[in-house]
Amino acid sequence: PLVIAFENNYYSSLAVSLVWAYLDFPNLSLNLEPFGVNSVTIDDIVIPTNESGQLLINYMGPPQTFPHYSIADILADRLPKDAFRNKIVLVGATAIGIYDLRVTPFSSTFPGVEIHANVIDNILHRNFLIHSSVTRFIDVCSIILFGLILGILIPRLRPITGMIAAFLMIAAFVVINFFVFFSFNTWLNLVYPLITMATIYLGITIYHYFKEEREKKKIRG
């Protein structure tokens, strides 16, 4: 979370505090709505959050996307003199044995300190992933719309044609989802609409199969 509530007070996270200090302590504000936190603002940077003050992290890549330096090299003065000039420096452990590793989309052993680095990078470059009440509304509409289309279309098609139509709809939805994500940094739910479409297709297919079997038995009888 970017903010933590404790005894009726709100406290900023490490990433927010570091960016605030790096930008020379500009205006820092918390934007609240009746349902909870809406966003955090640092100067003119508006950071979108969920109602709990959590940021959806836009990971820049796998571990060591950001430069790592060994403390031994620093103590031995083996680094360039300007290695840390005008940089935000995070000090933390990255060894597996210290258990400060987290599961992320890029790795199951992602150093916790580099997660903070990703958050800081997101804030400074305003490179946020969007998942708001609007996108949640779109998610619901997608479930209803694709469900209705399949529910109306599949019963009117032959089995092979229906299977092709269902596959094309699912493929189109996946392509649109990825396009929106990579083009607009907007996260639309992929799982629930796909489950809905698969369930409706399988349900209708199974229903028609047993219906045809009953009709065949009647004809034989």
What do the predicted segments below correspond to?
Residues P1-L148, T186-L194:
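Flexible inter-domain connectors and hinge/loop segments
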Residues N122-G221:
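Transmembrane alpha-helices and their extracellular/periplasmic helix-loop junctions
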